[in-house]
Amino acid sequence: MSKIFVNPSAIRAGLADLEMAEETVDLINRNIEDNQAHLQGEPIEVDNLPEDMGRLHLDDGKSPNPGEMAKVGEGKYREDFQMDEGEDPSFLFQSYLENVGVQIVRQMRSGERFLKIWSQTVEEIISYVAVNFPNPPGKSSEDKSTQTTGRELKKETTPTPSQRESQSSKARMAAQTASGPPALEWSATNEKDDLSVEAEIAHQIAESFSKKYKFPSRSSGILLYNFEQLKMNLDDIVKEAKNVPGVTRLAHDGSKLPLRCVLGWVALANSKKFQLLVESDKLSKIMQDDLNRYTSC
């Protein structure tokens, strides 16, 4: 008579399968009970429902009565009229700008000049905004000018720290004296030229964003500083850089900019750390020399 031997590991595996099957059955039963929980307990009386629930009715295919629909408070149903994220114009505009940025990088890698790429891109963005964000009716140009004036007055009335003003005034006065009168206000009459100037300034600053420049330190040493340490957006840096005498004219001509002078100017106006570390008198002379050298070329 032959004997049948059973491997103990097979027995243990079979017991484990039985335990898993029992747990699965228990889980299914609990799910069924949870799904049928609304069938248990006391029945709900229709008369005891809240007042808003009494307005609910089954759709029989007929159009609802406008009088009854008007009684419902608009504030309770504002969420129903909110657009999805995909339908939000600002979300679509953000996606469009991301695609534009990718396209600019590709064109620059292909060897095209940034100034040419930027001028074309600006026109495309303006066209996109004009088509997808039309001006709302009922607002005249007078309202826009009034709002703009209000914002400008608000900016002018914002107090500035006296310490920042006193430390940066010396360098700015020296730079003004060195370069003569400010650049001509050609940008006020030619918007495309103004955009091209900003693009040229942004391009040159971006190329040397992490490059460190030498400045005189208060400890009789050398202070190394770069645009990246400003912790500012490139657009804000460009706006401040346009205030440096002669920079706008140099950018319009496509000449190289005195980036160390620009960095010192922007840092004096926006970085308290730079103001505390730099020697302002020596910095004024350095900025003056840089402006003289670049504007005389």
Curated annotation (Swiss-Prot):
Motif Nuclear localization signal per UniProt: ranges: 211-214
GO cellular component, one term: host cell nucleus
Residues modified to Phosphoserine: 63, 162, 210, 271
Biased composition (Basic and acidic residues): 140-157
Record keywords, A-Z: Chaperone, Cytoplasmic inwards viral transport, Host cytoplasm, Host nucleus, Host-virus interaction, Inhibition of host innate immune response by virus, Inhibition of host interferon signaling pathway by virus, Inhibition of host STAT1 by virus, Inhibition of host STAT2 by virus, Inhibition of host TBK1 by virus, Inhibition of host TLR pathway by virus, Interferon antiviral system evasion, Microtubular inwards viral transport, Phosphoprotein, Viral immunoevasion, Viral RNA replication, Virion, Virus entry into host cell
Gene3D superfamilies with a match to the protein in the record: 6.10.140.1560, Phosphoprotein, C-terminal domain
Coiled-coil segments: none
Post-translational modification: Phosphorylated by host PKC and by an unknown kinase.
InterPro entries for this protein: PP_M1-like, PP_M1_C, RABV_P-like_C
Chaperone in keyword set: yes
GO biological process, one term: viral transcription
Residue ranges with Polar residues bias: 158-170
Molecular-function annotations in GO: RNA-directed RNA polymerase activity
Annotated spans, Disordered: 132-189
Residue ranges, annotated region (DYNLL1 and DYNLL2 binding): 138-172
Motif mapping: Nuclear export signal: 49-58
Domain of life from the UniProt record: Viruses
Stated family: Belongs to the lyssavirus protein P family.
Biological role stated in the UniProt entry: Non catalytic polymerase cofactor and regulatory protein that plays a role in viral transcription and replication. Stabilizes the RNA polymerase L to the N-RNA template and binds the soluble protein N, preventing it from encapsidating non-genomic RNA. Also inhibits host IFN-alpha and IFN-beta signaling by binding and retaining phosphorylated STAT1 in the cytoplasm or by inhibiting the DNA binding of STAT1 in the nucleus. Might be involved, through interaction with host dynein, in intracellular microtubule-dependent virus transport of incoming virus from the synapse toward the cell body.
This protein's name: Phosphoprotein
Lineage, top ranks: Viruses, Riboviria, Orthornavirae, Negarnaviricota, Haploviricotina
